[in-house]
């Protein structure tokens, strides 16, 4: 995060905000700056990626599903807008520790004999390490003592949209993001890679709420995609993983997505629409409005 803060200091905070007597390495200044940068970045990333996903990826026919809530999209957005600032407070404390040199983040790929190989392996290990921890944290949040108070708000959205991706109780949101911050305190990680992975995990979180269940057949047994996560929202006790199905298989919580078997929400909406159309046809109606008497054939 020091790369982002350095740029923010150079282009904005130092010339326009803080007095010259307040040094850039002052811990209070760093804390305030990180709060601003973290919140601004979170909102931009959320709204930009979720909006693109909602308009260009999300299947809007899912909004016809009976479990899709009234005003759900606006409710998802408002929940997220209220939660992100609270999530940022403990997150900034971890960013501050990284900024002040307590993590194993590094700048120079040449610091390691096999620099590029180490960098590639660190990406792979990051994904598997965080996937493992998120699985157990997520599963723990489903315990009856925690679920009602912390995780239940996220399960309000049985048929989620991309805007539900970050609609968490603040404690829930922070706990599920914690593995990403733990990793660089345990393992060396390049600073640019860390920022890239931070963006990636947020985009992935949006993608598993986008209702697009298309996954190449060869990856279906391994990747925990939107189809898996939608079943988690609807059925509660399955598919806790973030990226992969590995820990769900180990933990006995894996469920083959119902959508891959033609039993998911898309199929439900399709069948519901077909039945509705057939019913209108049987009654000699060309449209729902005509059948409901909202206008006459002469109109």
UniProtKB/Swiss-Prot annotation:
Task: Give the pathway listed in the UniProt entry for this protein.
Answer: Steroid biosynthesis; cholesterol biosynthesis
Q: Which residues form a coiled coil?
A: none
Catalyses which reaction(s): a Delta(7)-sterol + 2 Fe(II)-[cytochrome b5] + O2 + 2 H(+) = a Delta(5),Delta(7)-sterol + 2 Fe(III)-[cytochrome b5] + 2 H2O; lathosterol + 2 Fe(II)-[cytochrome b5] + O2 + 2 H(+) = 7-dehydrocholesterol + 2 Fe(III)-[cytochrome b5] + 2 H2O; 5alpha-cholesta-7,24-dien-3beta-ol + 2 Fe(II)-[cytochrome b5] + O2 + 2 H(+) = 7-dehydrodesmosterol + 2 Fe(III)-[cytochrome b5] + 2 H2O
The membrane-topology field of this record reads:
Multi-pass membrane protein
The portions of this protein that span the membrane are 32-52, 79-99, 117-137
Residue span(s) of domain Fatty acid hydroxylase: 124-252
Position of sequence motif Histidine box-3: 228-233
Q: Histidine box-2: where is this motif?
A: 151-155
Modification sites for Phosphoserine: 253
For the biological process aspect of GO, one term held by this record is: cholesterol biosynthetic process via lathosterol
Q: Which cofactor does it need?
A: Fe cation
Query: What GO terms fall under cellular component here?
Result: endoplasmic reticulum membrane; membrane
UniProt keyword annotations, A-Z: Endoplasmic reticulum, Iron, Lipid biosynthesis, Lipid metabolism, Membrane, Oxidoreductase, Phosphoprotein, Steroid biosynthesis, Steroid metabolism, Sterol biosynthesis, Sterol metabolism, Transmembrane, Transmembrane helix
**What Enzyme Commission number(s) apply to this enzyme?**
1.14.19.20
Short motif (Histidine box-1): ranges: 138-143
- Where found? Endoplasmic reticulum membrane
| Molecular function in Gene Ontology | C-5 sterol desaturase activity; delta7-sterol 5(6)-desaturase activity; iron ion binding
Enumerate the Pfam families for this protein. Answer: FA_hydroxylase
Q: Which family does it belong to?
A: Belongs to the sterol desaturase family.
Q: What is known of its domains?
A: The histidine box domains may contain the active site and/or be involved in metal ion binding.
Q: What does this protein do?
A: Catalyzes the penultimate step of the biosynthesis of cholesterol, the dehydrogenation of lathosterol into 7-dehydrocholesterol (7-DHC). Cholesterol is the major sterol component in mammalian membranes and a precursor for bile acid and steroid hormone synthesis. In addition to its essential role in cholesterol biosynthesis, it also indirectly regulates ferroptosis through the production of 7-DHC. By diverting the spread of damage caused by peroxyl radicals from the phospholipid components to its sterol nucleus, 7-DHC prevents this form of cell death.
Q: What is this protein called?
A: Lathosterol oxidase
Organism expressing this protein natively: Rattus norvegicus (Rat)
Gene name, please?
Sc5d
């Amino acid at each position: 995060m020091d790369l982002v803060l350095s740029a923010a200091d150079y282009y904005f905070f130092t010339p326009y905000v803080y007095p010259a007597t307040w040094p850039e390495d002052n811990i209070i200044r760093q804390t305030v700056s990180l709060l601003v940068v973290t919140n601004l970045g979170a909102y931009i990333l959320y709204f930009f990626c979720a909006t693109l996903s909602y308009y260009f990826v999300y299947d809007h026919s899912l909004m016809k599903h009976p479990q899709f809530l009234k005003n759900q999209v606006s409710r998802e957005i408002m929940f997220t807008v209220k939660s992100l600032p609270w999530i940022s407070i403990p997150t900034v404390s971890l960013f501050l520790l990284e900024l002040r040199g307590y993590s194993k983040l590094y700048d120079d790929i040449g610091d390691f004999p096999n620099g590029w190989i180490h960098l590639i392996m660190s990406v792979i290990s990051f994904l598997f390490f965080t996937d493992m921890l998120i699985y157990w944290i997520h599963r723990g949040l489903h315990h009856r003592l925690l679920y009602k108070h912390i995780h239940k708000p996220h399960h309000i959205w049985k048929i989620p949209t991309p805007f539900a991706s970050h609609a968490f109780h603040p404690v829930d949101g922070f706990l599920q993001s914690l593995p990403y911050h733990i990793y660089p305190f345990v393992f060396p990680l390049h600073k640019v890679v860390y920022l890239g992975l931070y963006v990636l995990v947020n985009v992935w979180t949006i993608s598993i709420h986008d209702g697009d269940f298309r996954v190449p057949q060869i990856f279906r047994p391994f990747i925990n995609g939107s189809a898996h996560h939608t079943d988690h929202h609807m059925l509660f006790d399955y598919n806790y993983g973030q990226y992969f199905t590995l820990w769900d298989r180990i933990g006995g919580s894996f469920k083959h997505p119902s959508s891959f078997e033609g039993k998911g929400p898309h199929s439900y909406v399709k069948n519901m629409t077909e039945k509705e159309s057939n019913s209108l046809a049987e009654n000699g109606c060309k449209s729902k409005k005509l059948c409901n008497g909202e206008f006459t054939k002469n109109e």
